[in-house]
């Protein structure tokens, strides 16, 4: 395993572990999701550069656009949750408590 592959895999796994273990605030979950998407974006960009294929060069930009849409939807949910519940704790999002 090359150092580049190790770094990208480590970044993705750290984001996944953060998402699994630190689920108290919605903002921290969104940041962990963004870290995972950034690791995937870098991996896909390096993969398309390694192959020298022009057809694969649009995939990282498409994934970056989807990541930006995911971030904006997540922040909109964060604002809506903070306005209705007064907090961004994940326990406030339980449907049985609403």
Swiss-Prot record:
Record GO biological process: ATP synthesis coupled electron transport
Keyword NAD attached: yes
Reactions it catalyzes: a ubiquinone + NADH + 5 H(+)(in) = a ubiquinol + NAD(+) + 4 H(+)(out)
TM ranges: 1-21, 26-46, 59-79
The enzyme's E.C. designation: 7.1.1.2
Membrane topology value: Multi-pass membrane protein
GO molecular function: NADH dehydrogenase (ubiquinone) activity
First-level EC class: translocase
Record GO cellular component, one term: respiratory chain complex I
Compartments in which it is found: Mitochondrion membrane
Signal sequence region: none
Origin superkingdom: Eukaryota
Statement: the UniProt record of this protein carries the keyword Transport: yes
Keyword terms: Electron transport, Membrane, Mitochondrion, NAD, Respiratory chain, Translocase, Transmembrane, Transmembrane helix, Transport, Ubiquinone
InterPro entries: NADH_UbQ_OxRdtase_chain4L/K, NUOK/Mnh_C1-like
Family statement drawn from the similarity comment of this UniProt entry: Belongs to the complex I subunit 4L family.
Function recorded in the entry: Core subunit of the mitochondrial membrane respiratory chain NADH dehydrogenase (Complex I) which catalyzes electron transfer from NADH through the respiratory chain, using ubiquinone as an electron acceptor. Part of the enzyme membrane arm which is embedded in the lipid bilayer and involved in proton translocation.
This protein's name: NADH-ubiquinone oxidoreductase chain 4L
Organism of derivation: Gadus morhua (Atlantic cod)
